[in-house]
């Protein structure tokens, strides 16, 4: 149960205990965002987010992140229009240290002038990075078009000229005005008591901060939309990104809950009206959604669509027509009940992680009027009726006062005149209601606890079919997760069928022998669950999560999809077309282009050289018959590893699994052997020219297998280089301001994978960036890592594992895949012991094994 108290200096603390896992989350919500900036302060709120981690009187540059990661934690921040949030999550035994670091950063930031100059350069690289992301550019255009007076119209990150022009005096003035106790909320959730939180908060955040109450810069008010606004930009992009928005209410408006219901009905999830009509039935868009954004002040109700290689006008009109139907007729009660249950279930799923609960409490307390508003919100959701949905649709979906913005490819025929004409046509038409949907009714979600005490340990069973079943009871939340994994994925593909695994994953849940595609989507929603398939380099999986009260129905639906997917012709052709369109639009994602070019250059024979998405010729050759054969080859129960984790009864799981997966369907054809990749004997380079703001770099080497004895030292080496206290981050970002992000990663597989460093930087910085990367890698080969740095990396890895395994789905995935790959389902429980046993000599040895510059592969993608 959440509680709240205030310190004498005005700082508010909200706390909720959760002793399920030894993890704690602290978040400091500062009630200032980019919308509070004066014109001469544009970009300062976001710049503060960067600067508060750059040192205090007690902790120099880099020490804040280093201290948190040394105690197994993660620290970061985000800035929005209305608030700036600093957050840490870590092992609860180090909870005091985590809050100490967070409080010191927010209360005592030094704002060193030299550090400010360096961080301004980093933010400018972040701005350039956003220029290479069509989704970011389209979003900025929407807010600029919708808010012509209000500061919501400015990007949170600011503009390069403004960021470079800020002085230390400006930064300090903004800090002293807004970073004061009465303007801050501490949200504390996890394995800590209220007594502990109260004592630490008073010691670390109490007392007089010496910052008097000062007037805030008033926000300009946005006038009501009086007419249609259209702003379209044509540029070198492959896809069309469109938004259509209507003026909406703020978070405290009584219509806000009903608009959330409307948004989910219209455009959230596979069973939403836009998805079914515009994406599935008519195949007009790559993606489409509707959303209600309710910030502190009037927000937006909007629909967003991404169109590739189809008529933008037709897709735009189809989207508007679906919106219009919501104003013309009331939604069916069963459909409404399902959506309301989905919204209510979000509160249950959020309880799986301490950081999720901390974010919810911080948001309610800082922005939404207090933590009590959560109960009021869900009460309002429960009271929404079909008539109420139609009422808010008629009030806010106003085609004569819409804002339309878009980012379009060169040669697009969609113009401002076209957009205005479509709006007029839809507004003047009398839309026919969409056909009634056959939706299974949902019962209201009751916010109850889990069903009882869990059994200790893991149950492992071999079913008669040969399937391996893993069951772990975890009763802290009334949810359960299922993960069914088989060997396959990219490693099983050839150039001729490259992309088959992804297409199978995209169509796996789109209908069964018993249920049509739309029926499967509705059934999942009626159970307030999720069901999806995914494909990786060495395996494929089907995964699901449901409320535990729906165990029998959820498990049966999961088994039905696994055993009898239909792969209908229409669904396969639709997803195949979409996959081909995405291949045609790859150049809009330069980081992906760089990584795929790296794989093709590093691997010359192994399937790892292939794209996870396939190539045009191979994807065009795929048919429903090919998918059915691929499914039959891989997804027989005899090949299956099935993990079930959560609020379940082991006996019931065993019985259900035996019914569903206890019999093998046929004699299974073995996967073909994969020839080993020939050794690399010389440096390899590749370059692709793209007209982008930054150059995307990948520098890498052959890597390891899942089962290699030096895998754990390789993880430690990767961590020493990555993270906010990692060597690459500290040297290339913090000291030299070469990039917004730089990271190292190790991708292992059934066969040897790769180790790589990735970075995006301005083209003129590329030679220095590559030299800097090699310099940091060489140090690991030449000098054993100091013991204190090694311990920090070890604690970070162990803490990150604890944080990452809070969700049932994460534990189910880890158990299933570790078992599938022959490492055992409880390998993750030995993780801390294995990591903590690593020595400096182990790290140096693996660095010398992997980091051979005579065999490096370097890829550049950019101007």
Regions found by a protein language model. Name each.
Residues 125-126, 130, 220-233, 341-350, ...:
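Short, conserved secondary-structure transition motifs
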Residues 270-271, 721-725:
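Short Ser/Thr-interspersed hydrophobic loop/turn segments at strand-loop and sheet-helix junctions
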Residues 140, 168-204, 401-402, 591, ...:
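Non-catalytic, conformational "gating/processing" segments within enzyme and secreted inhibitor domains
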Residues 1-15, 193-233, 375-485, 649-688, ...:
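Proteolytic maturation boundary segments
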Residues 14-16, 21-47, 61-105, 136-161, ...:
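M16 family metallopeptidases and their MPP-like homologs
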